[in-house]
From Swiss-Prot:
This is mRNA 3'-end-processing protein rna-14. Residues 924-946 have a biased composition (Basic and acidic residues). One of its GO terms (cellular component) is nucleus. One of its GO terms (molecular function) is mRNA binding. SUPFAM superfamilies: TPR-like. Residues 1-245, 882-980, 1075-1167 are annotated as: Disordered. It is found in: Nucleus; Cytoplasm.
Length: 1167
């Protein structure tokens, strides 16, 4: 076949007829075709540059000539442009716009009086004498003209079409677009509303319009003047407000431009139709919408409500027939149940109606009873059975039948993970135990595992679907990086988690023999639910189809069978209908057809198989080509609209704007170029999509039908390549792929000719040139490879904007010369690369000589000294404050000392009167800026440095502290020293607490909100010292008064600091733990406890022996002190008002003395 195949010539049949390949290609014909194509597009070289239009760029698209004009090809009759059918003619301009452009528009300068007739401008006078004559016109004539104008408009609307005056003049060019049809064709007296769009005209008849309404509506229509233009002077006409555009027309325009993306326009249009009581129009809108969104259950429900509100039961049943089986939605199926119950009266004596409703319930539960939101339907079904004929527990056959139906319904419902499964289980328990406790326990024990599985599954399902939006109004997925992309992908991930959870079989249904196929049915149901929300996400369609193929699963009449092809293909077909532009779905469908189609050796079977495989490819190609055509139409419309607006602005400005023509032209061209660039980017993306679809089709045809040819029944690969060139919009990838197939598989020299043709079409495509050089190297044609390399890189480097394209060519050729060439050639290439790409590292090219894709011997480091080169870095454990992100600097003022919730300590003598207090005798003056914002353990080097004074500690403690500071020990963290400082160790109690807290990945309980916890601690009210002292004294006085009423305390305290009773007193002595509890007052003047003897004291004299005893508090913060034994003593009898209340009262206000030797900062504030 290599002798008679010309891949570059569409019409030629053999290579022998065209021996001059590469020398003559009919450039004259191509030039004519190219000119004709440009004529169709109506893009002039003076106003539009080629690089802004992908269609006119020969370097990026299909079979087009090179820029140098050389279009060598095989045959004289070969015309690549003649087979490219992707050119889009410019849309014809509207007649009204043509009139506005061709008709003369008189100018009306401000300084001159315009000449008008009938309220419209008809001329302009530059002569002062004429203006004087106009001023002499009587004012009555103007009033008569103004009175006659509405009358003429009414006549035009009522169909007379003739003016009362004899003369008539054409309407001025500035008239609105709606005036043209009124002036040429009379309108009927009955008003007709016509909404005109590209799809057609939709006409709605309305009642006759009164004449007054016509008069008002016709005020904006150009009236026929009754007098000549020079008759009356011009009085400035009052500006007439244009009527607001019809909302229906606006919504229709949005839907026409973007039917799948204008969801809000669809919804508003339906709402508007219903508000206007336009039933027929609403039906049409519903049908159009549901053709695009066939699983929009909410819109189906609205459509049903519309028909049922009009009692159109046949139409409602037709709607149910269309949507019920394809839309598994609980709300929609609930409406079906409501309709069945509405049409069947349960009071029927024959019982036929109840039987129909019962069958409807069974039908609904079989289809959507698996839904996690179907609990209401299950509950209604059980109630329907309960209120049926018969008595539960009776002995009649009807009673027994009712009992069996209830038991069956309960046993089915409690196995489904629904929200009310607990309620249904309780009802089932009562039902069984009410009949017979012995048999009831048996049934309950049998169904208890299923119920527990359903209960736990419902909990897990609620956790998985938290945040899921189960919408049935799908939206197009936002592009990555644009608004809504993260939210959309989050919804996709939640659906995937739900599907994966169902596949994990949490209900143990895979091996359930009582319910065969229920496991597969649940998974298919979740896939259908996901596709209702993700209709425009092709990956979900492919995932569902692939699962059916892998598991050989499908459903026939709601029963699972073992024929997965039907259901999987159905998913693919439905996905392609929803996403006709999806390349993924097309490839998957074609791949499945190719792998499952029967294989036979005869030519007829191969032809049929090839046609079946080509069908998905052709469908997606048609869609992509149509999208490019639509883009070109939108581009032309936007440019025309922009030019029209620019022209209107220039006409308003007049001749006052006399700026330079060059600057004005640049300003006008800038927005047009921006529009062209935007559409060019979209068109380029679609062109690459089309090219890769053609590559996939060519490869598939080679597998199915072989190499093929143009004039043979089995076209194969070559016929597919011919069709691709005929349709156009190809990139260089197609030529490179076909050439590689020709040479790699068949060793046919046609591959080289395809490369030659591609080199002429894409002379500046670096990727295609790179593949061409590799092809020449594979044929050992090193000379031509070098020539091609030098030619292309010289062409690219001559243009500064294309220098970057030469880099991959240099890199490949440098690598090739390094491996197989001479050192002199390698050195020359490196010098050229250094001049062209100075930003690259100097050793990058030299290193690339000896490196491979797997290892680079130059950059790899050899370990000479492990002790020196492999020394681990010092890992310093950061403090708690360093582990947390640094808080921003506070913007508030430091609170005053008197209002601070901290314990009020003594101020430093060196501190000024306005300085904040230093808790517990600070050793140095503190900075008064942002005192509360610095973390306790933050490195002071990050803030203002300070000089620490001499330590007030003397003796051994002072020497130890000074030694630690000199050695850079723990004290360095507080002194703000440099790198030698170490972080202060964490207290043992805190370390123990942190060790008990589980790791975050293993903690699945309730999590505290840190910000709210900090806010709670900030809002805790800590009393001031003076207020606390005053309150304590008041409570002491109250306790003394109560003690005086019960009698005094005697001596002789009990063991363990308890104390004894004396006289009529009933209060026992307070233990030592609370007797020495102090207030959070200043350390300098520590008050004595009021409970330690003295006049008026209520304590027994035995407690005085413990006054001078040292406080039994440990010095270490990590030690533990057991409570005194008196705390665990036996309380006094209940009938006596003993000492427990007093002990609790003292416990509320008393505090133990704070230890003086805290090692890690100040003691905490009081409780």
């Amino acid at each position: 076949m290599s002798d008679d195949y010309d891949p570059t010539n569409i019409n030629a049949a053999s290579w022998e007829e065209q021996e001059d390949y590469g020398e003559a290609d009919g450039s004259e014909q191509y030039g004519e075709a190219e000119g004709s194509e440009q004529q169709d597009i109506q893009h002039s070289s003076e106003h539009q540059e080629a690089e802004y239009s992908v269609e006119s760029n020969p370097n990026d698209l299909g079979d087009h000539p090179s820029q140098d004009g050389n279009t060598d090809d095989v045959g004289d009759d070969y015309d690549p442009a003649s087979v490219v059918t992707s050119s889009v003619p410019a849309p014809p301009s509207a007649p009204a716009q043509e009139d506005s452009k061709t008709a003369p528009q008189p100018a009306a300068p401000v300084a001159k009086k315009p000449r008008t007739a009938g309220g419209f401008l008809v001329g302009d006078s530059d002569d002062e004498d004429e203006d004087g004559d106009d001023d002499g016109e009587p004012q009555q004539q103007q009033q008569q003209q103004q009175q006659q104008q509405p009358h003429q408009v009414v006549h035009k609307e009522t169909g007379s079409g003739a003016s009362s005056s004899g003369g008539s003049a054409p309407a001025p060019a500035s008239a609105s677009a709606t005036a043209a049809p009124q002036s040429h064709s009379p309108a009927p007296q009955t008003a007709t509303l016509t909404v005109q769009d590209n799809a057609g005209a939709t006409t709605f008849n309305a009642p006759p319009v009164p004449q007054q309404v016509s008069h008002q509506s016709g005020a904006t229509t150009a009236a026929v003047p009754t007098t000549p233009s020079s008759a009356a002077p011009a009085v400035d006409p009052t500006p007439v407000t244009q009527p607001a555009p019809d909302r229906v027309a606006i919504y229709e325009d949005q839907i026409r431009d973007d039917p799948r993306g204008a969801m809000n326009a669809w919804l508003e249009l339906m709402k508007e139709k219903r508000a206007r009581n336009d039933i027929d129009g609403a039906r049409q809108v519903y049908e159009r919408f549901l053709a695009i969104f066939p699983q929009a259950a909410d819109i189906w429900v609205e459509y049903l409500d519309l028909e049922l509100s009009l009692n159109n039961f046949p139409q409602a049943e037709g709607i149910f027939a269309k949507c019920l089986m394809t839309t598994p939605n609980v709300n929609l199926w609930t409406r079906y149940l409501d309709y069945i119950r509405r049409r069947n009266d349960l009071n029927d004596s024959t019982g036929q109606a109840r039987q129909t409703v019962s069958q409807a319930y069974e039908f609904v539960i079989d289809n959507i009873g698996l839904d996690k939101d179907s609990g209401k339907i299950w509950a209604e079904y059980i109630q329907f059975i309960k209120f049926g004929p018969g008595t539960v527990g009776g002995s009649q056959w009807q009673d027994q039948q009712k009992m069996d139906q209830l038991r069956k319904a309960y046993q089915r419902a409690i196995c489904v993970p629904i929200s009310n499964v607990n309620t249904l289980w309780k009802e089932y328990d009562q039902f069984e135990m009410g009949l017979n406790k012995l048999t009831g326990r048996k049934y309950l024990s049998e169904k208890s595992p299923s119920y527990m599985s359903a209960k736990s599954a419902n909990t897990a399902l609620e956790h998985i679907t938290r945040g899921l939006n189960r919408t049935n109004l799908p939206r197009l997925p936002p592009a990555p990086g644009f608004d809504g992309d993260q939210e959309f992908m989050e919804q996709v991930e939640i659906w995937k988690k739900w599907i994966a959870w169902e596949k994990s079989d949490p209900l143990d249904l895979k091996d359930d023999k009582d319910q065969p196929g229920l496991y597969q049915k649940r998974i298919l149901y979740v896939y259908n639910q996901a596709l209702m929300a993700l209709r425009f996400w092709p990956e979900m369609w492919v995932d569902a189809a692939q699962w059916c193929f892998d598991n050989n699963i499908t459903t026939v009449e709601n029963k699972v069978t073992k024929d997965g092809n039907a259901n999987g293909v159905e998913f693919l077909i439905r996905g392609i209908e929803a996403n006709p532009e999806s390349v993924l779905l097309a490839f998957k469908h074609a791949d499945h057809i190719e792998s499952t189609y029967p294989i036979e050796e005869n030519d007829e079977a191969k032809i049929q198989r090839g046609e079946a495989v080509k069908a998905p490819y052709n469908k997606v190609l048609d869609t992509l080509y149509a999208m490019i055509k639509s883009l070109k139409e939108k581009e032309a419309a936007q440019i025309a609209k922009l030019q029209e607006m620019t022209a209107a602005q220039e006409s308003k400005a007049g001749s006052d704007n006399e700026d330079g023509d060059g600057a004005a032209d640049n300003i006008k061209k800038a927005p047009i170029e921006a529009i062209q660039k935007g559409y060019a980017a979209q068109t380029q993306l679609l062109s690459r999509m089309i090219s890769f679809v053609w590559i996939a089709l060519i490869r598939a045809m080679r597998r199915v039908q072989g190499k093929g040819g143009l004039n043979v029944p089995l076209g194969g690969m070559r016929k597919a390549f011919h069709d691709a060139r005929a349709r156009g919009r190809l990139t260089s990838d197609v030529y490179a792929a076909v050439a590689q197939l020709e040479w790699t598989i068949y060793k046919d020299p046609a591959g080289g000719k395809i490369f030659d043709r591609g080199a002429k079409l894409f002379p500046e495509d670096e990727n295609f040139t790179l593949e061409n050089i590799k092809y020449l190297h594979s044929r050992d044609d090193h000379t031509n490879a070098r020539v091609l390399f030098e030619t292309v890189v010289n062409r690219l480097t001559q243009k500064p904007e294309l220098v970057h394209k030469a880099k991959p060519l240099y890199q490949y050729f440098h690598k090739y010369e390094s491996q197989f060439g001479e050192l002199a050639q390698v050195t020359k290439l490196e010098k050229r690369m250094a001049e062209l790409f100075p930003e690259d590292p100097k050793l990058a090219a030299f290193t690339a000589r000896y490196a491979s894709d797997k290892f680079d011997p130059i950059t790899a480091r050899i370990i000479v000294s492990p002790t020196t080169q492999l020394r681990p870095k010092n890992m310093i454990m950061p403090s708690i404050e360093q582990q947390q992100p640094q808080l921003p600097m506070s913007q508030r003022d430091t609170p005053a000392a008197g209002f601070s919730p901290r314990p009020q300590g003594l101020k430093s003598p060196s501190a000024g009167p306005g300085a904040p207090f230093a808790p517990y005798a600070a050793k140095r003056p503190l900075d008064d800026r942002d005192y509360d914002d610095h973390p306790r353990k933050i490195a002071r080097s990050e803030h203002d440095p300070f000089v620490r004074g001499a330590s007030p500690l003397k003796g051994a403690a002072g020497r130890r502290l000074d030694q630690q500071r000199r050695m850079g020990g723990a004290a360095g963290a507080y002194s703000g020293s440099g790198a030698g400082s170490q972080v202060a160790p964490i207290a043992r109690d805190i370390t123990f607490l942190l060790s008990q807290i589980p790791r975050v990945e293993f903690y699945d309980s309730h999590r505290l909100n840190p910000s709210r916890m900090v806010s709670l601690l900030q809002n805790v009210k800590v009393p001031e010292y003076l207020d606390w002292k005053r309150e304590r004294e008041r409570m002491q006085q109250m306790q003394q008064m109560q003690g005086d009423g019960y009698g005094g305390y005697g001596g002789g305290g009990g063991g363990g600091g308890g104390g004894g009773y004396q006289g009529g007193g009933h209060a026992r002595n307070i233990s030592q733990d609370y007797a020495y509890r102090e207030s959070p007052g200043p350390l300098g003047g520590r008050p004595l406890s009021p409970f330690t003897g003295g006049p008026g004291s209520r304590l027994a004299s035995a407690t005085a022996a413990y006054r001078q005893a040292p406080v039994g508090r440990p010095e270490s913060s990590g030690s533990y002190e057991p409570p005194p034994a008196a705390q665990y003593g036996v309380p006094p009898p209940a009938q006596y008002d003993g000492g427990w209340a007093q002990q609790q009262q003292q416990q509320q206000y008393g505090q133990p003395p704070a230890p003086q030797g805290y090692r890690y900062g100040n003691p905490p504030p009081p409780y």
